[in-house]
C-alpha cells in the first residue's frame, strides 16, 4: 500500500509518497487488515478501525444535487392585532363651531376673542359669521370675574 500526504516545508503542491511500513503478510500491525478493493478504503473494520485514517474521497454527483427544500412553518398564523385594524373615520380634531376661529389653532388670538373671523372654518363660508354658543351668553364683567382663576381669600 502507498501512503500519500502533504509534506510541509517542501513548497506548495509537493506531495510525499512512501510505502506502507508493514507488508501485507506482516503480522506486527495491531489493526486488522481489510481486503484491498479497487475503489480504495471502504470503511472501518472492527471496533478500533484502521491503522491510518481513510483519505476522504469526493462523492460524485453531490454537487449537482439541490438542497432539500426548507420545511414550512406548520404553526397556524396569529390572529390580527386589534390595533392593526383600520379605524372608522372620526374627526380627530374636535370642531367647536361656537368659537370664532379655527379649532385646529388654539393659539390663534382670533379664536379667543369675540370678533368674527373672516376666513372659513372647515366648510362654513366666511361671509356668514358663526354665532356664539347660547349657553355661554355674552361676556360681561360679572362673568369675567367668575371665570377668573384667583383663589378667594
Curated annotation (Swiss-Prot):
Region (Disordered), start-end ranges: 24-87, 101-153
Top-level lineage group: Viruses
Comp. bias (Low complexity): 27-37
Biased composition (Basic and acidic residues): 143-153
Protein name: Uncharacterized protein 035L
Originating species: Frog virus 3 (isolate Goorha) (FV-3)
Lineage per the UniProt record: Viruses, Varidnaviria, Bamfordvirae, Nucleocytoviricota, Megaviricetes
Amino acid at each position: 500500500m502507498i501512503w500519500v500526504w502533504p509534506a510541509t516545508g517542501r513548497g506548495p503542491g509537493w506531495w510525499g509518497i512512501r510505502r506502507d511500513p508493514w507488508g501485507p503478510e506482516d503480522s506486527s500491525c495491531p489493526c486488522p487488515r481489510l481486503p484491498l478493493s479497487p475503489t480504495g478504503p471502504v470503511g472501518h473494520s472492527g471496533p478500533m478501525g484502521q491503522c491510518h485514517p481513510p483519505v476522504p474521497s469526493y462523492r460524485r454527483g453531490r454537487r449537482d444535487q439541490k438542497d432539500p427544500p426548507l420545511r414550512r412553518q406548520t404553526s397556524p398564523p396569529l390572529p390580527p392585532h386589534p390595533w392593526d385594524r383600520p379605524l372608522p373615520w372620526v374627526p380627530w380634531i374636535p370642531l367647536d363651531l361656537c368659537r370664532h376661529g379655527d379649532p385646529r389653532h388654539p393659539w390663534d388670538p382670533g379664536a379667543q376673542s369675540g370678533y368674527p373671523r373672516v376666513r372659513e372654518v372647515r366648510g362654513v363660508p366666511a361671509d356668514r359669521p358663526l354665532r356664539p354658543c347660547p349657553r355661554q351668553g355674552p361676556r360681561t364683567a360679572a362673568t369675567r370675574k367668575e371665570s377668573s382663576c384667583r383663589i378667594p381669600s
